[in-house]
Amino acid sequence: MRYPWLRLAIFIVGCLFPLWWLYEAAMNLLGPDPGKILMDRLGLGALIFLLITLSMTPLQKLTGWSGWIVVRRQLGLWCFAYIVLHLLCYLFFILGLDWGQFAVELRKRPYIIVGALGFIGLLALAVTSNRYSQRRLGGRWKKLHKLVYVILGLGLLHFLWIVRSDLREWAIYAVIGGFLMVLRVPAVARRVPRIMGRRGRVAS
């Protein structure tokens, strides 16, 4: 296994935050509605993991270090894990497993539909994020995994719909997401290594 310490560090960080939040909830440090706080933090954590995952390819191109790509799948799976926990918090703490209320929520809060679509997309990517699926799908695998940018857009829209009144934090993530999308445009992606190469030659 390549870069085991980096993989271990990501695993520890991925576990640490939910465990710490659970500790805060157990100690009554999350206020009167700890379930909602947990749900919100896990959703935001998933968005952050998604942005970090999408930054791995540009970082590899900029630095030439293969470690970024090696941990990309692991980061993506942590994003999915946080989304699953986010969804479970919603089902248990917000709905109380009342499926009749779920239908009402869908009508009243369309952002839940947007979030559900993002979850379905992430589920498809998580299930196929293995070498077996790569071999079976062939060229279609890359096309499928480009869906991650649609998922990012859905995640940002879901977040925007929830915050509405205070857009400052949302704007930070939206700018980062937009920048990462621009870096994936073929014309831009081709120029980035050249720009870095020119800087390296100037510095030397």
UniProtKB/Swiss-Prot annotation:
The keyword Ligase does not apply. The keyword Thylakoid does not apply. It comes from the Bacteria. GO terms for biological process: protein repair. Keywords: Cell inner membrane, Cell membrane, Electron transport, Flavoprotein, FMN, Heme, Iron, Membrane, Metal-binding, Transmembrane, Transmembrane helix, Transport. It is a multi-pass membrane protein. Binds 1 FMN per subunit. One of its GO terms (cellular component) is plasma membrane. GO terms for molecular function: electron transfer activity; FMN binding; heme binding; metal ion binding; oxidoreductase activity, acting on diphenols and related substances as donors. It is found in: Cell inner membrane. Its cofactor is FMN; heme b. Its main location: membrane. The chain crosses the membrane at residues 10-30, 42-62, 75-95, 110-130, 143-163, 169-189. Heterodimer of a catalytic subunit (MsrP) and a heme-binding subunit (MsrQ). Belongs to the MsrQ family. Part of the MsrPQ system that repairs oxidized periplasmic proteins containing methionine sulfoxide residues (Met-O), using respiratory chain electrons. Thus protects these proteins from oxidative-stress damage caused by reactive species of oxygen and chlorine generated by the host defense mechanisms. MsrPQ is essential for the maintenance of envelope integrity under bleach stress, rescuing a wide series of structurally unrelated periplasmic proteins from methionine oxidation. This is Protein-methionine-sulfoxide reductase heme-binding subunit MsrQ. It comes from Pseudomonas putida (strain W619). The gene is msrQ.
